């Protein structure tokens, strides 16, 4: 009887170790980003610098138009770019302000108040297919202008949401650049 208990205990311990090993070796399926990317691309703007305040005209308190952006150091093997603008400080969690994909990888400038030509625009968290400027309920929020370089052109229809975009980007990100600005009411 003692040997049977030891064998059963050993089987449970081995099973537990196997489950633990499988769990911790499994890649994080919730992330659109691969484990390692180069982070060589740079995103800048003529109207605000990294960690500075975003001018009022680019917010819901102003003209609510997108700021001009410049993208440099895009890798040669890129097939398309994705632009995501979001606010991680929103009370309900990350709030998406703009989704644009299938941007031509030769694009170096995104003009003020315009989406890149021939790109697809997704539905932001305001429920619109356009840029929605900073509009925090209170306090200072951070706004990230993220540009992803992909090894493919995405087969995703205009009007898709952030979750759909994140899912289809998985495994295709070669590089990323971002600019962070702040805004407060």
Locations of regions flagged by a protein language model:
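N-terminus-centered regions that define maturation/targeting leaders and the start
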Residues: 2-185
